[in-house]
Amino acid sequence: MSIKLAVPCLLLLAGPAAAADPLPDAIAALGESVVLSVHAEGAQVYECKAGTEGKLAWAFREPIATLLSDGKTIGRHYAGPNWEHADGSAVVGKAVGNAPGALAADIPWLKLEVTAHRGNGVLTSVATVQRINTNGGKLDGVCDKAGEFRSVPYSADYVFLKKG
């Protein structure tokens, strides 16, 4: 085999491995397989509350998002956090790991352990949810009136995984 042929072959072999960035360890779900991956468009809702030192600060309240697959609405995401599929299946999660978003304005990537299931359908076997590829969602600015609410647009991808 000539060098002219060997170099492109090596580049082809190395290409996909180099292009695929692994998830941060804090949100990886080793040994689990993907059940469903969806895109979400929505808002992170914040409330102005007194913080630990008595000063007013924005506190995360809840997400409100539409879950999309191939441009079609297939579910929703809301406080709990809950993810509800159009087939009636739903899961509730609890954050167990996080990693920073790409930009300062991006909410963090999360790993959530499923703590409850409802209904039967595509989400029935889900054990873990990952929130990745976040864009936006963090609130910046002054908070000066307790009880005030603000919504910050965000998008993310949610990956639903099962054991094995």
Task: List where the protein language model places each region.
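Bacterial N-terminal signal peptides that target proteins for export
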Residues: 1-7
